[in-house]
Amino acid sequence: MARVGILLLNLGGPERIQDVGPFLYNLFADPEIIRLPNPILQKPLAWLISTLRSSKSQEAYRSIGGGSPLRRITEQQARELQSLLRQRGVDATSYVAMRYWHPFTESAVADIKADGIDEVVVLPLYPHFSISTSGSSFRELQRLRQMDERFEALPLRCIRSWYDHPGYVRSMAELIAEQVRASDDVEHAHIFFSAHGVPKSYVEEAGDPYQQEIEACAALIMAELETIVGHSNPHTLAYQSRVGPVEWLKPYTEEALEELGRAKTQDLVVVPISFVSEHIETLEEIDIEYRELATESGVVNFRRVRALDTYPPFISGLADLVVASLEGPEVNLDQAAELPTTVKLYPQEKWEWGWNNSSEVWNGRLAMIGFSAFLLELISGHGPLHAVGLL
């Protein structure tokens, strides 16, 4: 029997306060998170932003106990998935590959090779594909395969996204139903889906299917919820965690909550739709910041649906995905990371940016001026980036 490795991809998170700065640096150094036309600026900008945001982020992590629970939860998900697959007759071993903190992808790949795995199923713990989540992890795996002949020779099957998988949809609907039934007015409880946002340009210029998959997923969950509770409920989909002055997917969670507050919403059931584990964005951003905002805006009862974590039907759904991947047609890394052929990933060709040799010189000069302005604002603690909330 072939030995199968299940490679679970996730974001990662700082486990201690002192890890916050390095974690943020790794995050912002990824060109899929901050897209710049000149890659030479990526690391200096990542250092600058992580330095400026570190203190605020540390306070957020202190409010949830001093660190992220993401690694602990993801490793528990991995153990339970491994156990269930072995019960189903699959000789599976699970591995966790975090993108921006330990255990890093390189570590998971080293363990896979050391264990003599015959075949790998790559399963992102992101139900919805995005350039900045699954896409970034897929491209990191592509980079590692190009550098390692042994890893490159290992058969890899990828699961690109699974937002419409019945096991996931049903699990989400069941957990939402728990909070709907606890509401004072079950038929009018307002379901509020809060998804992690991405810049609008990712969707409109780079062809990211994220928004389409999120919207389709919310519709599927609402239909399943209706079969469980026996009635339809009003719902809203909004996007959280916006950073910086650029336009992100709308409506923004903050603005949508304020609007529902003005409407004197009695029962609000908040659903972290793009998160399968408790972490900083559920425990601090939703449970503390958004709860306070909603209450101040006029929402009477704020209920948050728990993350899937190790909910048994959810783990069973993940096992179904793995088995289907092993039995179905192979989806390789290139196919999993692919975007529509009509668009290009950044950076585009020079002529599409209007560049020539002369303009590149000026672009470089302007970039240095801009970076100098960043440093000046870092030293002074004042400036336009502080004013708009980026720093």
From Swiss-Prot:
GO terms for molecular function: ferrochelatase activity; metal ion binding. It catalyses: heme b + 2 H(+) = protoporphyrin IX + Fe(2+). CDD domains: Ferrochelatase_C (cd00419), Ferrochelatase_N (cd03411). Keywords: Cytoplasm, Heme biosynthesis, Iron, Lyase, Metal-binding, Porphyrin biosynthesis. Pathway: Porphyrin-containing compound metabolism; protoheme biosynthesis; protoheme from protoporphyrin-IX: step 1/1. Its EC number is 4.98.1.1. The keyword Metal-binding applies. It is found in: Cytoplasm. InterPro entries: Ferrochelatase, Ferrochelatase_AS, Ferrochelatase_C, Ferrochelatase_N. Fe cation binds at residues 196, 281. GO terms for biological process: heme biosynthetic process. Its main location: cytoplasm. It is an enzyme of class 4 (lyase). GO terms for cellular component: cytoplasm. Catalyzes the ferrous insertion into protoporphyrin IX. PANTHER family: FERROCHELATASE (PTHR11108), FERROCHELATASE, MITOCHONDRIAL (PTHR11108:SF1). Belongs to the ferrochelatase family. HAMAP family: Ferrochelatase. This is Ferrochelatase. It comes from Synechococcus sp. (strain CC9311). The lineage of its organism: Bacteria, Bacillati, Cyanobacteriota, Cyanophyceae, Synechococcales. The gene is hemH.
